[in-house]
Amino acid sequence: MKLVKLSLVAALAAGAFSAANAVSLEEAIKDVDVSGMFRYRFQSDRYDEGNGVIANGYNSSKNNEHKFKSQLNFKAALDDNFKAFVQFQYSTTENGFGDTRNSRGELVRSVGTDTHSTFAVQQAYLEYTNEAYATNVIFGKMEVNSIWTDDAVGTGAKVINNSIDGLTFAGYWFDSFNRADDGDFGSASIGDASLYGAAVLGDFDPFAFQVWAAYSASWAYLYAVDASYKFAFGEGMDFKIEGQYLGNSLDSDKKDRLKFKDGSFYAAKLSADISAFDLQAGVVGYGDKDGISVTTLEDTGRVIAPGKQIFYSDGSNLTGDLGENFFYFAGVGYTFAEKLRLGFDYVGGTTKITGQQDVDKNEYVGSVSYAYSPKLTFSGFYSYLTEDQGSFNGDDQFIRLEALYKF
């Protein structure tokens, strides 16, 4: 973040936080922090069922996607104990020429360059700070920031306390979520209800942990634990071991009427930084072969989920799917001169569904990233996912190129 003195952007922020009594422009913007980002993504996805049927894809039937996202953040000190935050976001997905089909196989045409979408308010909240009790109270529209969500936004309140060194206590309530605008809530997600919860986060280097508990009204009780430990062998050989467990107990009506099952997720990962190399390996297990179960509320949440496609494949979607999954993974990367990183990752395993043949899945990912400057990064990856079920063989090739600027 940087302090803005006088600019068009800061004037816009001043307008967002105008008081009942007029003040000078210089006075209004003197304590406004401005930050933000701009991201452009080009991506293309091609799925081949192995019998000549190609869904989506590139080349002659391309459905290339151009995704633009920009955020402008303004944080203003209103008084000694109050701050206001607003985030404006611009986000579009523009498809190239070709046939695009949705998850139901229906043809969707969305071709052309978008020149009409505008910035919208993504977050807007008021924050009260009591330094004597090391407590912050936040209420409004904000990112949920839970272990079950990635970047979901909800309307509600949080209370955060840091009165004990190394410990953070949090309580939260969300009355609604940006389910329609986000696009990463699953159709079977339990994110359709108010969420009440608490968390304890501890960081006592080299040991850290998180304990989460929540109640999704009339849906489920959710709980999660994350623990990690760091250790080293000499200079330049740093290791970290991490374990996670997430579970939920669904309302009996949802089990009986919708045939859902209680969710259970476990994962373990060992990672290492040895000189210019970074390595990781581990296992992940979750799901139920007899009914739909849910692990996360939105996208892949903050769980251990390596790879780029496998956790979105049929039977393996973390926001709700039918299938018992067990995967193992490994990856290695090398960074040149602290700027250019090349990486390779592998994820493999099986999805089981009662009454069906097991699906063997393997994903191979090659990635590259280049830190042009502390603020500007270029990156990309190629992912190849195979799914084998008896005589059926499918493969999915996914490419993404990205430019990201932060300030």
Labelled PLM ranges:
Residues 2-140, 160-162, 227-235, 243, ...:
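Beta-barrel outer-membrane channel/assembly domains of diderm bacteria
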Residues 20-37, 41-54, 58-62, 198-215, ...:
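Glycine/serine-rich loop-strand microenvironments at binding/catalytic pocket rims
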Residues 48-58, 100-110, 176, 183-189, ...:
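Solvent-exposed loop segments that connect transmembrane elements
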Residues 58-62, 142-150, 216, 246-261:
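Outer-membrane beta-barrel proteins
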Residues 118, 144-156, 175-180, 190-192, ...:
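Solvent-exposed loop/turn segments connecting transmembrane beta-strands
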Residues 134-146, 157, 169-176, 198, ...:
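Transmembrane beta-strand segments that form the barrel wall of outer-membrane beta-barrel proteins
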Residues 161, 166-229:
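Internal metal/ion-chelating core segments
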Residues 203-206, 228-352:
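Detector for outer-membrane/organellar transmembrane beta-barrel domains
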